[in-house]
Amino acid sequence: MNKKKRRVAVLLSATIGSAVLVLSGCSGKSDQTEKTLRVGVITYTQDDPFINGLTDELKEQLKAMENKEQMIDAGCDVLCINLVDRTAPSRIIRMARNEDIPVIFFNREPVREDLVQWEKLYYVGCDAEQSGIMQGEIAAEYINSHSEVDKNKDGKIQYVLLEGEAGHQDAISRTEYSVKTLMKNDVILEKLSYQLADWNRGQAENRMNRLISQYGKKIELVMSNNDEMALGAVEAYRTVGYAREDWPVIFGIDGLEEA
């Protein structure tokens, strides 16, 4: 069997998080021409640790690139896009279609009406429903085996929810199925409030501080759409200085090592 060698080069824009991933593969034979695949990668933010985890190992080879149009002009064979707004991919779809460049959306799913526009549009992402169910199952198992979670002993768990962002399908599904799963597992809930924190630790800490100011020690459970926001909630409680036994239980999603 022939051994294949691959070189990877990435061009990334610091402003919009764009990259061109160049994959070159060739066999050991000298008479074969090297084949190169140029993949444009566009992420909505470089501040999201989950997204950064996809590109960290490539950062040594970063160079500037301004926008999606330049990726198409650069001759990319495929575009991989993490949308800023899942409801507004029409322009990039039109541009890619005009050049016959397949598009793979990831982590933020476009609305179905956009995905069915063209047979070369794809979506790759986690199963948000399953994530919500798993979070609910883990939380329910803990709550049902730790009676101290119900601090006021009223038979209900007073909770707040940190949601990723308005209109994000993953946030909607994670929220819906985590709460449904808790109730399905005989956890009686009383919702105190919810806050949007844009998947961000700092914003979650600020929102959690507001919730603590409003509800104090009434909060018995914090459900978060991701680990970053859950860690923000932890920081808020550290800042407030509550004794550890007065903290609520806090659950996130993503499996970040720090969490």
Model-derived segments and their meaning:
Residues 3, 26-259:
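A residue-level marker of the well-folded mature domains of exported/periplasmic proteins
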